[in-house]
Amino acid sequence: MALATPLPATQAAVKVTGPSTVDVSAATTLPVLEAFEVLVRVACVSINHVDGKSADMSPTPGATSGVDFSGLIVALGSKVDSDEFRANNNMRALSIGDRVFGGVFGNNPLRHDNGAFAEYVAVPARLIWHMPAAMDFSTAATIGATLATVGLALFQYLQVPMPSTQTISDSKTIPDPQQKTRMALVYGGGTATGAMAIQVLKLAGFRPITTCSPGSAARAMHLGAAATFDYRSPTCGADLREHTANGLELALDCITDTASMSICYEALGSAGGRYVALDAFPLRGHTRRSVAAEWVCTYTQFGHAVAWVPPYNLDARPRDREIAEAWYVVAQQLVDEGLIEPYPKEDRTGGLAAVGEGMRAVWKGEISGRKLAYPIAEECY
């Protein structure tokens, strides 16, 4: 293992202590670094809805919480340098001192020592992004989970063709006129994941349409939505079907409740299509046999089982890992070329000690239209 400097014997980390409760442990172990992982000194973290939700519905006492992070690489696993994946895909090699960002599996029953809300986090070397020179740690910490989730949802579960690094360089979109006219619905375009999905769909050559509040419509259009629809309208589903001439085939549901599922199903054309949710959807909402319905758990990208309570107990999905690795290559280019616009954020103080309060606020729905970011290590800035 290559090290920047000697590592401390212990670290501070936000630990799950019970249902919906977390606390900072001042002296817990660092993650055990696996051969194909890098160890990151966490500079900044951000809060996702899943952080509080998972601590509520499937708490793992003693597990480190948190998904999104940015920071500096301080150690390389024993096989990182010999892995040719990044070189074969024209990605920068990972080196000690590199500025990076991404997401990990926090509150993991199978790995208590690893999560983003800590001073150090271990990350697969193939599933981490370099930060562009002009990007700050706070912004980078808000991107990882949404970028990974959208990639897996679109290119694995909705089966959207993934753009290659070459097609991005050539035209910034897939150069297929028919593909460019194909529409896809993003339900919840005002959310962080919805905003990311709109951008990625447009870059993949689609015409994204979205549901959102009137207050979020202008931003959705700015990001690339071809049209927006007020999800509160009683005719929202019918309006979507009319707008798409009864031909809509793809719907990504970033909200996932009975109301959102009903509108998506009404919007999909009479020939059916694919519906992908970002959570386990209510089975009573699956009302059309012509619609293939699936849901995404981004943690399957790591290639291991998810050992939460049902329905979140999932076997390992090797194909998800394959798609994720391919997507990280493409996404790195999108980030490098400034083609991804980050979601609005609010920088907060207090470090790890304040993260628990932010988790609760996001989980309770008290935060809207922005992500909360918390600097952790001032020496990284």
UniProtKB/Swiss-Prot annotation:
Tell me which UniProt keywords the record has, alphabetically.
NADP, Nucleotide-binding, Oxidoreductase
GO BP: ilicicolin H biosynthetic process
**Binding annotation for NADP(+):** V50, D51, G52, K53, S213, P214, G215, S216, Y231, L278, D279, I367, S368
Record-level Gene Ontology MF annotations: nucleotide binding; oxidoreductase activity, acting on NAD(P)H; polyketide synthase activity
Its UniProt pathway annotation is: Mycotoxin biosynthesis
- Provide the E.C. number(s) assigned to this enzyme: 1.-.-.-
* Coiled-coil ranges (or none): none
Q: What does this protein do?
A: Trans-enoyl reductase; part of the gene cluster that mediates the biosynthesis of ilicicolin H, a 4-hydroxy-2-pyridonealkaloid that has potent and broad antifungal activities by inhibiting the mitochondrial respiration chain. IliB collaborates with the hybrid PKS-NRPS synthetase iliA to assemble the backbone of ilicicolin H. The PKS portion of iliA and trans-acting enoyl reductase iliB work together to construct an octaketide, and two methyl groups are introduced by the MT domain of iliA during the chain assembly.
The family assignment reads: Belongs to the zinc-containing alcohol dehydrogenase family.
* Protein's recorded name: Trans-enoyl reductase iliB
